[in-house]
Amino acid sequence: MTEKTIKDWEALAEKELRVSPEGLVWHTPEGIDVKPLYTSDDMSGIGHLNSLPGFEPFVRGPRATMYAGRPWTVRQYAGFSTAEASNAFYRRNLAAGQQGVSVAFDLATHRGYDSDHPRVQGDVGKAGVAIDSVEDMKILFDGIPLDRISVSMTMNGAVIPILASFIVAGEEQGVSRDKLSGTIQNDILKEFMVRNTYIYPPEPSMRIVADIIEYTAKEMPKFNSISISGYHMQEAGATLVQELAFTLADGREYVRAALAKGLNVDDFAGRLSFFFAIGMNFFMEAAKLRAARLLWTRIMQEFKPEKASSLMLRTHCQTSGVSLQEQDPYNNIVRTAFEAMSAVLGGTQSLHTNSFDEAMALPTDFSARIARNTQLILQHETGVTKVVDPLAGSYYVESLTNELAEKAWGLIEEVEALGGMTKAVNAGLPKRLIEEAATRRQAAVDRAEEVIVGVNKYRLENEQPIDILQIDNAAVRTAQVKRIEETRRRRDSQKMKQALDALADVARSGKGNLLAAAVEAARARATVGEITDAMREAFGDYTAIPEVVTDIYGKAYEGDPELGVLAGRLGEATKRLGHKPKIMVAKLGQDGHDRGAKVIASAFGDIGFDVVAGPLFQTPEEAADLALAEEVTVIGVSSLAAGHRTLMPQLAEALKKRGGEDIIVVCGGVIPRQDYDYLMENGVAAVFGPGTQVLDAARAVLDLIEGKRRNV
């Protein structure tokens, strides 16, 4: 048989297609041109091909036997309502096969507010569990043996009081801190880029990171001091190259901060962990994890560690939240299963699989069971655990691994040229690039250039709402306030004040360890809010200035008659109003997830609206004041954290009290269909759920403006 060449294949492909196979090249958002065929020629120059699992550069995995020796940890992220409700949920799941606990805190806790603070009325218990003191933490882990069950906590802004409360809760359960195992996220740099649950400015925030690394290295040898997260970057719109590069650049910055504390790299590097998102780009996501291990080894070699474990990247993964769709939601089960398989083939150490209903609300017991069992089926029924790194040697996957690594390294070097990640964050580079990528993707989805089944193709004509978990925010807040009052009544106030004063002195002086001081304050029953405020006196608050990218969404629609018709209507409305229709895009409460708000502000601006980008964390009253001062026609509220039932009626009432009834109020985001009527009855003119195309939303807003003008 005559050996065939790539030229032979090209000729045959062209005969089948009747055009050149070059038209099959997939131009990805990462700037990688994926070919329809890969061969041994694509392996040339790839340096890691002969590496083995358990040995540097760890492309094939950090452990020699990987899942053949022990499967990945099933670690489902959850938390809602009260500590009692979340504890019951954790215990049910542990009994059903879950192998670790991963805690989701509510936004009030993330931002360092106690549940009785007036700014968090709509946030308590809604998107996670409310924790105000050690008393809540003890209830959260009641009956869960902390010396045997590892605990992961997603916490960044209020990381000091939360970790301190966890340490004390463990002590009072009879588990000393050196026996506690798990992970604290403690990744503040990405908060300034995408998630926004920061409290203090970047510099003191980096001190907090370093103090936690120092404390855990000395006192908590089984505990991971940081989980460096790319997950939230991808959720905010980052490409896989951006997620990879910015996450590893964050990691490099944290290592430098720990070294500046006088630590030896081998004292802490083995306890650094990572956290990546896994989306629907199946092979590229698996290759991303392989590239991450390769690049992290390269970065850590700069610091000349003696232990091989200091060079290893160990990661947790979570299936994509962005890929979850409200429309035809049972499709999400399939999406999550594919993403889980991709994470496993990429070599994750632990995994969370999202529940199919999380595009609308917190998961129910039913949806959480399906999500958990997705992993158990992978572990026990597919045979995927039997072979270490089964994708190794694949022409396609090895080429992708190499190209992702090269492109990510180029972006890492760009960050270095700015002086490292803290300076890059201050310069706004990562945030701008991620927001541009998010806006481009929204345009691609709206134009059906990127197909999402059930959303922009193969849509159901009639969809039935599914059962969702509803949280009674008012009841949760009442219960939390009662417990706070009881805690304050029973504690030794003088001892508590002395502990807070000592913490404030450590913060002001720069001497001592913040976490060590906070542990004493938590033991004296200082609350999360009180510990946060003690440090706030020294560090101050951080306030981001809203900025919006331009000419991204509009460019995607250049020459499109659909946009031309809308622009014509906007021109007519401008003549009638005497100015461009003006919309304020607002975020209420402690919901810092601003991807949707930024995309809407950017796209509406490109379409021709006059856009006011409101600041994060506004109260309804503050939003009403700003809307009146800016003389806006419309307020568009983006809600992604379930606070809409409380905050939207409060906004309508605030506008009414100020004589702003004529301002049209609309909202969009993660809002269950079951809530639409309630919102419409409480001052909301239109609701735009997940999957709404931007041009459809713009047309609907313009319809409301025209109708309002005609009624005047």
Swiss-Prot record:
Which cysteine-cysteine pairs are annotated as disulfide bonds in the entry? none
Give a Gene Ontology cellular component term annotated to this protein. cytoplasm
Task: Please name one Pfam family that this protein belongs to.
Answer: MM_CoA_mutase
Q: What is its EC number?
A: 5.4.99.2
Q: Which gene encodes it?
A: bhbA
Q: What happens when the gene is disrupted?
A: Cells lacking this gene show no methylmalonyl-CoA mutase activity, in contrast to wild-type.
Subunit structure as annotated in this protein's UniProt entry: Homodimer.
What is the protein's species of origin? Rhizobium meliloti (strain 1021) (Ensifer meliloti)
Q: How is its cofactor bound, per UniProt?
A: Monovalent cations such as NH4(+), Rb(+), Cs(+), K(+), Li(+) or Na(+) are required for enzyme activity.
Query: What is one GO biological process annotated to this record?
Result: propionate metabolic process, methylmalonyl pathway
Q: What is this protein called?
A: Methylmalonyl-CoA mutase
